[in-house]
């Protein structure tokens, strides 16, 4: 994710991960991607006394009531293992409908970005890509749920699409287009 963010930001902006600054992440107890993005942005801004941009993103599957949603990483357990998370998605889909692989399962990948300076919210935006869940994981590119997400208008998963092509159509790119004017 950090590499993708670096690619999308202007080169004059320095990017640091929380671990590079030896900071633990805050508890993400918001109810939406936007809430969690703001929680992280405010938290890190207060820690380093600089404006901070934070991302919160995940997968929403309609038939699962928009789950995993804000819990997307947590579906992979404590280590956020997305192979586990993908297996859980398939398990949950099988519980809902044994025949789901023969249908189009509507889903979207969402990215919320926020910029905060201390307690002040400078900007908060959202980007999303609509699509469907692939009956089986495909591709080695990207990360997270990329191997099981097929964007509308494509026949391939994000995991099969080249990074350069994906960056031009994905949820994070759409969110960055909206937030660029605040950078």
Q: Model-derived features: where do they sit?
A:
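Anionic-ligand binding patches
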Residues: 1-183
């Amino acid at each position: 994710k950090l590499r993708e963010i670096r690619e999308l930001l202007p080169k004059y902006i320095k990017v640091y991960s929380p671990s590079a600054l030896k900071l633990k992440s805050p508890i993400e107890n918001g109810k939406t991607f936007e809430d969690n993005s703001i929680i992280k942005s405010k938290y890190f801004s207060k820690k380093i006394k600089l404006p901070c941009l934070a991302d919160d993103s995940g997968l929403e599957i309609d038939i699962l009531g928009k789950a995993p949603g804000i819990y997307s990483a947590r579906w992979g357990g404590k280590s956020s293992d997305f192979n586990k998370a993908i297996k859980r998605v398939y398990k949950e889909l099988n519980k809902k409908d044994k025949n789901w692989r023969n249908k189009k399962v509507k889903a979207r990948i969402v990215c919320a970005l926020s910029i905060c300076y201390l307690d002040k919210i400078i900007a908060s935006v959202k980007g999303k890509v609509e699509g469907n869940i692939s009956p089986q994981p495909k591709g080695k590119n990207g990360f997270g749920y990329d191997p099981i997400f097929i964007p509308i208008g494509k026949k391939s998963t994000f995991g099969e699409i080249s990074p350069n092509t994906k960056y031009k159509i994905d949820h994070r790119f759409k969110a960055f287009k909206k937030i660029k004017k605040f950078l």
